[in-house]
């Protein structure tokens, strides 16, 4: 049986998502460091509230005192980092409302899944979805801390496995002050 149309696109994107999600929540354990680990620089927020490390081939720019945009030189990956006020509700209630909010924001939204990852800041929600018409895989990570939360959004084109892996390394490098 041959899949056609939207079903084919969704199937391909869901497979691509698996790579992005694994890159975000699981470290790569190899005897040799990956190319992305070869050299890294660190971006520190203007108010010094957080920092992230990023590999060669990425550039970081400040967005005000509490945000950053990190983008690959070839534009095949981007990570947005924003400091937010402390969460008022639980992580589970946040995840419950997220699909509805994202469906309003992105007409081609297709949810893939949610999980919890352990970052240096503590437990974080990882919510991954595809945008079928845009052929993008997107992951939102919400990392609460005692005084604030940090939201990271990683976006990569379907099939950009190296960009997804590097975006995952950036997310996992988050440190909050």
What are these regions (language model features)?
Residues 2-5, 29, 35, 60-169:
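Conserved polar/disulfide-associated segments of primarily extracytoplasmic proteins
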Residues 20-41:
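C-terminal region of N-terminal signal peptides and the immediate post-cleavage residues
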Residues 35-63:
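N-terminal "mature-domain start" segment
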Residues 170-177:
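Extracellular, beta-strand-rich glycan-interacting domains
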């Amino acid at each position: 049986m041959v899949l056609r149309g939207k079903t084919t696109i969704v199937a391909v994107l869901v497979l691509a998502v698996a790579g992005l999600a694994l890159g975000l929540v699981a470290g790569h354990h190899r005897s040799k460091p990956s190319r992305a680990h070869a050299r890294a620089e660190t971006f520190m927020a203007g108010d010094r509230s957080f920092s992230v490390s990023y590999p060669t081939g990425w550039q970081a720019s400040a967005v005000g005192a509490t945000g950053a945009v990190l983008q690959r030189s070839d534009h095949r990956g981007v990570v947005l980092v924003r400091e937010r006020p402390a969460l008022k509700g639980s992580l589970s209630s946040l995840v419950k409302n997220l699909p509805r909010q994202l469906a309003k924001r992105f007409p081609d939204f297709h949810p893939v899944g949610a999980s919890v990852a352990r970052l240096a800041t503590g437990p974080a929600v990882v919510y991954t979805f595809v945008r079928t018409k845009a052929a993008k895989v997107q992951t939102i990570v919400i990392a609460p801390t005692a005084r604030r939360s940090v939201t990271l959004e990683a976006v990569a084109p379907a099939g950009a496995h190296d960009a997804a892996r590097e975006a995952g390394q950036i997310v996992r490098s988050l440190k909050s002050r």
